[in-house]
Swiss-Prot record:
The keyword Chaperone does not apply. Pfam families: Elong_Iki1. This is Elongator complex protein 5. The modification Phosphoserine is found at S252. The keyword Phosphoprotein applies. Component of the elongator complex which is required for multiple tRNA modifications, including mcm5U (5-methoxycarbonylmethyl uridine), mcm5s2U (5-methoxycarbonylmethyl-2-thiouridine), and ncm5U (5-carbamoylmethyl uridine). The elongator complex catalyzes the formation of carboxymethyluridine in the wobble base at position 34 in tRNAs. Involved in cell migration. It comes from the Eukaryota.
Length: 300
């Protein structure tokens, strides 16, 4: 499960709730990235650095760069700055990293950032973070950037949620029952169809996962060859094919704007000596023609 979430770059959105917290899964993904040799940047907003690093071993902590916004979110400790930028400055500084190889950026949390940064500005910063691609001749840029964003979805309206969902390459929605947590994963890969899966897991104290089962949410992702195929034409309200009598009846019909032989002859072989126009009128079957009063059917 962790490997599938970390397989591609871009924004990975972890949506939790009051009942099912997502920080444990976030730290499990951070541990997995660090053990793969990646540099991990953490923008900590909701808990202290000591609390966040608790539970990680020395190998993981050595690869973890913590940007602390918990103690001084608005840069009040630096009175020399005329306009403290706070969290926005931290995000912009992370956009200018010079690390080599793949980099994982963890935002704890996006909900806190949404409370201090306008949604449009935050989305622009997230797009800049997740879309960094290095040039072949530039060794200072990273190969792949992965942004892990923890989002408390109950705190936000549909506008902010919709904007972040549009940016995300992978969406993880946490729920569950009793002591087991489920993660419903929507993964969008470039030039491929989106995939839906759900996993049941438990997070251990060392932030490793114990998987219980994986169930696809949509059966068409893994089709069962033993299931009966439904005929899509079985319950139509119209006929796809005509019988012989129906075809003959269709061919014998006169189209509404089909020219008669007299009109065709007059149009194709005009009389040279005729200088005045000629009006052809072919009444329909339902026309009420009254020679004495031709305007009788007009609603005046």
């Amino acid at each position: 499960m962790l490997d599938s979430l970390l397989a591609i770059g871009g924004l990975v959105l972890l949506r939790d709730s009051v009942e099912w917290e997502g920080r444990s899964l976030l730290k499990a993904l951070i541990k997995k990235s660090a053990l793969r040799g990646e540099q991990v940047h953490v923008l900590g907003c909701e808990v202290s650095e000591e609390e966040f690093r608790e539970g990680f071993d020395s190998d993981v902590n050595s690869r973890l760069v913590y940007h602390d916004l918990f103690r001084d979110p608005l840069n009040w400790s630096k009175p020399g700055e005329a306009v403290p930028e706070g969290p926005l400055k931290a995000l912009r500084s992370m956009c200018k990293r010079t690390d080599h190889g793949s980099v994982t950026i963890a935002l704890d949390s996006l909900s806190w950032l949404l409370c201090h940064i306008p949604c449009v500005t935050l989305c622009q910063a997230l797009h800049a973070l997740s879309q960094q691609n290095g040039d072949p001749g530039d060794n200072s840029l990273v190969e792949q950037v992965r942004v892990l964003g923890l989002l408390h979805e109950e705190l936000h309206g549909p506008g902010s949620m919709g904007a972040l969902n549009t940016l995300a390459h992978t969406e993880v929605t946490l729920s569950g029952k009793v002591d087991q947590t489920s993660a419903s994963i929507l993964c969008r890969r470039p030039q491929q169809r989106a995939t839906y899966q759900t996993w049941w897991f438990s997070v251990l104290p060392d932030f490793s996962l114990t998987l219980h089962e994986g169930l696809p949410l949509r059966s068409e992702l893994h089709p069962d060859h033993h299931t009966t195929q439904v005929d899509p034409t079985a319950h139509l309200t119209f006929n796809l094919h005509l019988s012989k009598k129906e075809r003959e009846a269709r061919d014998s019909l006169t189209l509404p704007f089909q020219f008669s032989s007299e009109k065709q002859k007059a149009l194709l072989h005009p009389v040279p000596s005729r200088t005045t126009g000629h009006i052809f009128y072919e009444p329909d079957a339902f026309d009420d023609v009254d020679p004495e009063d031709p305007d009788d059917d007009l609603d005046i």
